[in-house]
């Protein structure tokens, strides 16, 4: 069953538990679950690899702009050396979407507020919560441990990261959320510098899925980033069967965005997903119970998936049994 479940490493897990990615990586390995490490994490690539041991681990790249390609190469080399076997490339978050709840909670900086004295005061308050500007350096460990980023920071500013950690944190955040998208042609750069499977995350249209086949990547993740980037964007589940029909026999189609229970996994698999990625559910477990809490979430999801199949009279999770024939559209029920 391990091919049916793959936790997506929500970045900034250190906010929810001091052991953060270390606990997540250990729990994933102990439960035979592949682990995906985000670029925006509070633990270095190497430390997570050590915690994950013999587990299967992938690296999720938040892709710097082309002018920072030396930093990208450095991260890829570090990940490969540390035993990460696949590269997951985030396409839909080179800039953060309009997130009212995050702004209400001071979770992201609202730049336009700085134009007034009140705005400046509010900005200082927000920055005390902004994960990339906190004094405990949540989300910036990969950058602060990267030799190329550190060398470029020193060359630019004339001092080491440790001499102004707030400036280093902010610069790393700007590096991995550059505000500049990449082109299809840029994928060739990743293929040149990564010799393992490449999976493009954030595919939401048949046309883009076909383009992924054309450029020769090994997989895609049908994903709208949990619905947090574009308000009113089409749901990933609605697009999944169309994309599977178009390219499912040519590359691996994975799915995320909204998985909360085993029944959700069953639906996605029935619609043709090869694997489901999860994020928020395991964060709940991590926050409440650390490594053991994560293990409980894994077992609960898998247990509910198995019960769902049993009670629906489905013999296995293989496509010969779990497919669209077992689904009924709500529109067809009335």
Question: Language-model segments: which ranges?
Answer:
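General structural feature for long, well-ordered alpha-helical segments within catalytic domains
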Residues: 24, 44, 71-75, 83, ...
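Active-site entrance/lid segments in N-terminal catalytic domains of soluble metabolic enzymes
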Residues: 1-210, 214, 226-229
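Short hydrophobic/aromatic-enriched beta-strand-loop microsegments
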Residues: 55-61, 219-224, 275-279
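Extended hydrophobic/aromatic segments used for targeting, binding, or gating
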Residues: 45-46, 210-213, 217-255
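Short acidic/polar active-site loop segments enriched in Thr and Asp
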Residues: 34, 85, 218, 274, ...
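Alpha/beta catalytic cores of nucleotide-metabolism and tRNA/nucleoside-modifying enzymes
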Residues: 238-256, 260-334
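Conserved beta-strand segments that form the floor/walls of ligand-binding pockets within enzyme
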Residues: 6, 199, 221, 254, ...
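Short, solvent-exposed loop/turn segments at secondary-structure boundaries
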Residues: 18-19, 231-234, 289-290
């Amino acid at each position: 069953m391990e091919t049916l479940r793959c936790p997506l490493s929500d970045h900034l897990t250190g906010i929810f538990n001091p052991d953060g990615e270390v606990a997540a990586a250990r729990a994933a390995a102990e439960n035979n679950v592949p682990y995906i490490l985000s670029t925006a994490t509070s633990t270095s690539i190497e430390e997570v690899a050590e915690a994950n041991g013999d587990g299967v681990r992938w690296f999720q790249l938040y892709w710097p702009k082309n002018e920072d390609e030396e930093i990208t190469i450095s991260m890829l080399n570090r990940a490969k050396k540390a035993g990460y076997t696949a590269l997951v490339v985030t396409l839909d978050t080179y800039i953060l979407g309009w997130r009212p709840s995050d702004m209400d909670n001071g979770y992201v900086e609202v730049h336009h507020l700085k134009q007034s004295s009140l705005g400046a005061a509010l900005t200082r308050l927000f920055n005390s919560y902004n994960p990339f500007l906190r004094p405990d350096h949540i989300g910036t460990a990969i950058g602060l441990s990267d030799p190329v980023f550190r060398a470029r920071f020193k060359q630019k500013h004339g001092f080491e990261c440790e001499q102004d950690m707030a400036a280093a944190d902010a610069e790393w955040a700007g590096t991995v959320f550059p505000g500049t998208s990449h082109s299809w042609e840029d994928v060739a750069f990743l293929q040149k510098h990564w010799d393992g499977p490449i999976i493009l995350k954030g595919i939401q249209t048949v046309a883009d899925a076909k383009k992924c086949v054309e450029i020769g990547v090994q997989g895609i993740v049908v994903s709208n980033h949990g619905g947090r980037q574009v308000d009113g964007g089409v749901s990933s589940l609605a697009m999944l069967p169309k994309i599977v029909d178009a390219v499912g026999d040519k590359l691996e189609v994975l799915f995320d965005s909204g998985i909360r229970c085993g029944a959700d996994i069953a639906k996605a698999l029935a619609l043709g997903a090869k694997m489901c990625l999860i994020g928020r559910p395991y964060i709940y477990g991590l926050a409440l119970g650390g490594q053991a809490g994560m293990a409980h979430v894994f077992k609960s999801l898998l247990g509910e998936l198995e019960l769902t199949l049993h009670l629906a009279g489905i013999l296995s999770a293989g496509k010969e049994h779990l497919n669209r024939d077992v689904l009924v559209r709500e529109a067809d029920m009335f």
